[in-house]
Amino acid sequence: LNAAALHRQVGDREEVDCLLARLEAFAFLHFITQTGDAAASALLQQVEELAARVGRQTVFFALEWNRLDPARAEHLLGQPERERYRHYLRALRQFAPHQLSSAEEELLQELRPVGRSAWNLLFDKLFGHLRFGVDGRTEEEVLSDLHHPDRAVRRRGADELTAGLRENLHLLTHIFNTLAAEKMIDDRLRRYPSWIRARNLANELEDRTVETLVAAVTARNDIAHRYYARKQQLLGVDELFDYDRYAPVPGGEEGQVTWDQCREIVLSAFAAFSPEMAAIAERFFVERWIHAPVLPGKRGGAFAHPCVPEAHPYILVNYTGNLRDVATLAHELGHGVHQQL
């Protein structure tokens, strides 16, 4: 293996990965807004099966690269023409102690469509179908009640959410336990020293960095305690319950925020920080890169979904018009701007 051959192989892999990433992004986003649609679900499954086949046929590259003698690998990485892929190749070698045999890695790639992704798909389908309360509301519509100034409305929303989840507790618990068990088995087979090591490697973080952060946050739990004690006083309640956590503080702004008002609030805030950031964020509105309405079958929550460097990201929110939704959109747009850059 010489430097030129390595460059060609990584370039070919990049081309395949980018094409596959586009297909996966389209299939996932097409499905996630209509989880009950059979055709959308079938398309996502087909793309995941294709990704598994491609993964099985290309997994050899990472395995062989990681088996290369360290001195030889560093020599190849030191070539000036390798600069484009140097970081990618160095990051791959961090996983060398945890890779399995070629046959085992190929088998795991083959099983991908019926492993973690299948359970995640089942979870998304389940939540896309869940309805809460006598009015049959969606998850996002019920969660919106938790931000209502009327405590009775918040309590009703919490009760409806709990009741709806309890009816599906057996299935949700099974999904959660299965995913946890798969993670445990994978960590054991790959000889990770702790449950978080694989994630830290993927994030290119040292364990001690994450442990320091966790310790620092845990050591100041008193900040959260003081916050909720003060909120209890401001709300004037004898005891603070879970459905009071997001209650608006008396005297603050209330009422519905239209989509146009939301857009103005978010872009104005971004512009005060960086006009360039606001200009990029505005493209998400103008070019319709945001999916905002609450729809039956649409997944709850919010996210910014990247694609490839040559394609723009997308944002999903479930906009119900409260201040929480405005903050959520601003948060996701921050990710979106980052991904676009």
Which residue ranges define each predicted feature?
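A well-structured
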Residues: L1-G252
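Extended non-transmembrane interhelical loops and adjacent amphipathic helices
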Residues: G136-E140, C262, P296-G300, A304
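Glycine-rich, acidic/polar active-site loops that bind/position phosphate-bearing ligands
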Residues: R166, H174, E211-T218, W259, ...
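Active-site recognition of the HExxH zinc-binding catalytic motif
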Residues: R191, T320-L341
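Short alpha-helical functional segments enriched in proximate histidine and acidic residues
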Residues: R220, A224-Y227, A269, G336, ...
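Long, K/E/R/D-enriched contiguous segments that form extended
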Residues: R230, L234-A278, E282, A304, ...
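Catalytic zinc-binding patch centered on the HExxH motif and its immediate surroundings
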Residues: G252-V257, I290-A311
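Short pre-active-site segment immediately N-terminal to the catalytic Zn-binding motif
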Residues: E253-W259, V308-A330
